[in-house]
Each structure stands twice: as C-alpha cells, then as structure tokens.
Amino acid sequence: MSQSGKNGLTYSDAGVDIDNGNLLVEKIKPAVRSTRRPGADGEIGGFGGLFDLKAAGFTDPVLVAANDGVGTKLKIAIDADYHDTVGIDLVAMCVNDLVVQGAEPLFFLDYFATGKLVPDQGAAIVGGIAAGCREAGCALIGGETAEMPGMYSSGDYDLAGFAVGAAERGKLLPSGDIAEGDVILGLASSGVHSNGFSLVRKIVELSGLGWDAPAPFAEGKKLGEALLEPTRIYVKPLLKAIRETGALKALAHITGGGFPENIPRVLPEHLAAEIDLGAVKVPPVFSWLARTGGVEAKEMLRTFNCGIGMIVVVAEENVAAVSKALEAEGEKVVTLGRMIARAEGAAGTVYKGTLAI
C-alpha cells in the first residue's frame, strides 16, 4: 500500500528537486536566446529542438554529427569550484570535430548530469555552453538536465555534448587529392584543451600543489584557473579560409592520441605526415607537465596536443594564401612538415627533429 497524507514521500525526499530544475531553466533562458541564428529561433522547453536548413541557406546539404565530453578536466573544475568555462570546452570538442569535415556547425544539445542540482552552478555551466555556441556560430536548441542522487556524489557532475553541422554536397573534407609534398600547417592551441587530464591530475598530485597555488607556468594565475583555460574553437577562422581560398585539403583536430593517432585519420593509406618537432612551439604548461611528471616526449606526443590544436593540409602553392586567411582571423600558424610516401604497414605520422620540452 502506498503512503499518503502529510507523511507521504515526495520526489524531493528522494533527492530530486523539480523546483530547482525549473529555476535553472529560467536562469539560462537569456544565455540560450543569445545563441539564436538563421534556422533556429525557438525557445527551449519543448520536447525537441527545431532547425530549418533552408533558412540557414543550404540547398543540397549533407549533415554531419559529433558528440563528445570534457573528461576529467571536470574534476578540476569541481575541486577548484570554477564552472564558467567547461561549457566552452564541451562545445569546442564537438564543433571542432565538425569543421574538420568541412561542415558548418548548426545546432548543439547538451546533457548535464549531477548528484545534486545547484541552480547557480548549472547556470554557470550552461552559460559557458552558450558562449561556446556563440563563438562557433551554432544554436543551443535544447538539452537535458538530470539530477541523479546515488549515481553521482553531491557536487559532482558530468557533461556530454551533441552537435550537428552541414556542408553542401561535394564540399566535405578531406578532399580526395591529398598528395606527396603537400604542406602541413599547425594552428596553436590555447593550452591543454580537454584531453590528457587524468595524467595532468596525477602530475599535479605529485607536485604537491593545490588548485589555488600560483601556476608555475602562468604568471598571475592560480593553478586550477590556468589548467582550465578553455579549448580553442577553430570553426569561424577555418570556415572563412575554406570559403575564401578553396585550398584546404584536410584538417585534423588534435585531441586524445595527439599527432600519431589523429593525423592519420584524415590521410589516404599511401601517405604519411612527416612532422618537424623542432617547429612546434611548446607552451610552458606542457614543459611543466613533462618536467614535473618525468613524462617522455613520445608519451607527451601521444597524450597531449603539445601546443598544436589543429592540423591543416594544403598544396605548397597555397600555403601563403591559407596562412594569411587564418592569421587575419587571429590564428597562429606554423609550418610543421610535409606529406610523404608511406609503405604498407608503416606509421601514418613520423617525426624528425626534437620536441623542445
């Protein structure tokens, strides 16, 4: 027999506060509205989000989808009690995976799960998601907030993101004409981005430093703040370069697995990327991680971006035009190497020179 009357249980007694959920929705509505774009101008709160491809200017589009998370970088945000930027990371990890296929990000949805919903914390997280969406030019058209007592400890949370983009048919990347001798350009990262943070946290533990300690590699910043520097969003500069020059043959987002795992994903089997490690300008954060953790260069390269967040492949005659277009949008461009012939069974990424860590 179910309980009734004044002693009956409520959902709140079980740890789920519907009123807090409703309060969060009201808090985030202005941030969500700020992401509206052609094709998406609805309000959140419906059973699903809508997007009008024709209103967005597409005629014969191919849809491209990606989903990702932020990983254990969230643990630093939780422990440091700084939640404003992890939403940017969430968007970046998804939309950067869209643009490498030549697609314009159109809309984004998030999943936010927590042990106990704190509206101000949730609003900070979603505010970051909205900021990332604005930077990428995509609309935040919906999401799910799940308060899950017993699944997560109070204060803990996890994030997942889902992005959909589009490219006109025939405009997808990589192109089919990547050739031996093509030049490999690298775009600078903003820091560690959102990969390798289990190793980062282990190194910080070994260092004995707290998240509020001065960052040894970033003057004027606390350690937690410096490590939480959000992932760079490359969407608008790359889309502009694609449209202005028509010369980009391939793009690779340097995430987990670094150069050796990510670059070969966009190459034909008969070609490999030869990277001059001496050309990589390694930011101080990576030097500190390598030195403090005793991490060898090979392990750094397969775990972190080491200062290069995006790879661009172009024909040699187009290097100047593509570099100029990207630099005009604020990107730091460096020539990293060339495409070379690859023997059957050989690695898709090979190195020359030494990584200066």
From Swiss-Prot:
It catalyses: 2-formamido-N(1)-(5-O-phospho-beta-D-ribosyl)acetamidine + ATP = 5-amino-1-(5-phospho-beta-D-ribosyl)imidazole + ADP + phosphate + H(+). One of its GO terms (molecular function) is phosphoribosylamine-glycine ligase activity. It is found in: Cytoplasm. GO terms for biological process: 'de novo' IMP biosynthetic process; adenine biosynthetic process. Keywords: ATP-binding, Cytoplasm, Ligase, Nucleotide-binding, Purine biosynthesis. The keyword Ligase applies. GO terms for cellular component: cytosol. Its EC number is 6.3.3.1. Its main location: cytoplasm. PANTHER family: TRIFUNCTIONAL PURINE BIOSYNTHETIC PROTEIN ADENOSINE-3, TRIFUNCTIONAL PURINE BIOSYNTHETIC PROTEIN ADENOSINE-3-RELATED. Belongs to the AIR synthase family. This is Phosphoribosylformylglycinamidine cyclo-ligase.
